[in-house]
């Protein structure tokens, strides 16, 4: 006779229990496998991140051009290169900086840093002036826009040009316009124009480009001797927008 305990009867089906347990184990194993694949993919993605050398053009002792306001180019270069580096770093890229600490550094030492690091790209950030004859003639307000330079003497010229195109496309998409002034057939300029729409020129003798053994390019972000252009380039929003555009172009070309 079954004793009535007052509790509901529990029926255990051993076959059903085994089936449920077996299914649970299979599900657990499958989940563990999926997690392992995700972790492996994340590790591979991290390993695939690019090494980028972001060079701040000039130094405090040799600050480059002087803007219409009297502020020197190095300060503009420092602001924009910091924005580019921050954007790349936020996306997990490995960023090395040169000339950001204010110390003197030779041009060849800048590219050597990229060579030693086996960097995926060396990019030098500058701001532009115009020839002295144009300054003396008071033509500053006629010139504006960015320019990108690559060197055919760089052994990775094709990759350099590809990166220049990617950056040029992002700058155009960000609302910037290219300056074609450096292609003018005048003394000190006359740089071969590779792509007028994207503002890409060849400047074969630029030391930081020709001594790099990795893809390399130089960007003139805008013309600071033009007072209107200088004021725009000094704005925090402009710096952030340019930094984001340049970083996006870098990531597009190094991921290819």
Feature map (PLM): residue ranges:
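Boundary at the C-terminal end of the N-terminal hydrophobic targeting segment
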Residues: 42-47
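Short glycine-rich His-centered loop
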Residues: 50-70
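Hydrophobic residues within membrane-embedded alpha helices
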Residues: 2-4, 24-30, 113, 209
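N-terminal secretory signal peptides that target proteins for export/translocation
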Residues: 1-23
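Extended alpha-helical regions
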Residues: 1, 24, 181-185
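Bacterial N-terminal signal peptides
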Residues: 28-40
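Active-site-proximal helix/loop segments of hydrolytic enzymes
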Residues: 49-51, 75-256
């Amino acid at each position: 006779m079954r004793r009535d305990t007052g509790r509901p009867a529990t029926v255990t089906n051993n076959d059903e229990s085994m089936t449920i347990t077996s299914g649970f184990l299979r599900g657990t194993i499958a989940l563990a496998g999926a997690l392992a694949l995700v972790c492996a993919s994340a590790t591979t993605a991290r390993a695939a991140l690019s090494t980028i050398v972001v060079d701040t053009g000039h130094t405090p002792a040799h600050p480059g051009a002087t803007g219409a306001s009297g502020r020197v180019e190095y300060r503009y270069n420092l602001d924009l290169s910091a924005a580019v580096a921050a954007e790349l770093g936020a996306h997990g890229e490995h960023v090395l900086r040169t000339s950001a600490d204010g110390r003197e550094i030779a041009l060849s030492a800048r590219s050597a840093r990229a060579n030693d690091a086996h960097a995926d790209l060396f990019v030098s950030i500058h701001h532009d002036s115009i020839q002295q004859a144009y300054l003396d003639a008071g033509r500053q307000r006629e010139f504006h826009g960015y320019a990108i330079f690559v060197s055919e003497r760089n052994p990775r010229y094709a990759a350099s040009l590809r990166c220049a195109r990617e950056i040029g496309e992002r700058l155009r998409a960000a609302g910037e316009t290219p300056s074609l002034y450096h292609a003018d057939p005048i003394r000190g300029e006359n740089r071969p124009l590779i792509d007028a729409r994207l503002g890409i020129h060849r400047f074969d003798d630029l030391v930081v480009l020709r001594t790099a053994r990795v893809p390399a390019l130089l960007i003139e972000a805008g013309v600071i001797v033009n007072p209107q252009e200088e004021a725009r380039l000094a704005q925090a929003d402009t710096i952030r927008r340019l930094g984001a555009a340049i970083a996006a172009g870098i990531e597009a070309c190094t991921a290819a």
